[in-house]
């Protein structure tokens, strides 16, 4: 279930626990990370670099893939998508 990063991290701070962030580069990595987070009942941050976003045909595709996986895999733990290691222009394009 996609959630807001600020809310996730505030809850982690208040609960005195950390949240893992893992960079995703393809469908297989994303699936594995989501399934493990669900098995551990742990929130997770999925990092997407500018390059990985381009490789996966854009950030809209990545977001749609994660939403679809959440639904089809029955992911109930909080999930955040994070734009990681990007240029200003690349990141701006991803959210416009």
Language-model segment annotations:
Residues 5-6, 27-74:
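Glycine-rich, positively charged N-terminal anion/phosphate-binding segment
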Residues 93-96:
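Conserved small/polar residues in nucleotide/adenosyl-binding loops
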Residues 70-73, 83-87:
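Generic hydrophobic/packing signal
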Residues 18-23, 44-48, 77-85:
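Hydrophobic faces of well-ordered beta-strands that scaffold small-molecule active sites
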Residues 25-28, 86-90:
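Glycine-rich anion/phosphate-binding loops
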Residues 1-20, 67:
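N-terminal amphipathic alpha-helix/helix-capping segment at the start of soluble metabolic enzymes
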Residues 13, 74-75:
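Short hydrophobic "helix-edge" motifs at membrane interfaces and signal-peptide entry regions
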């Amino acid at each position: 279930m996609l959630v807001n990063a600020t809310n996730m991290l505030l809850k982690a701070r208040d609960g005195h626990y950390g949240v893992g962030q893992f960079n995703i580069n393809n469908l297989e990595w994303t699936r594995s990370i989501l399934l493990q987070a669900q098995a551990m009942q742990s929130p997770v941050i999925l990092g997407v670099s500018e390059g990985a976003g381009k490789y996966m045909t854009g950030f809209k595709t990545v977001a749609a893939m994660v939403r679809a996986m959440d639904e089809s895999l029955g992911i109930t733990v909080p999930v955040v998508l994070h734009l990681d290691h990007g240029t200003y222009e690349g990141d701006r394009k991803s959210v416009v």
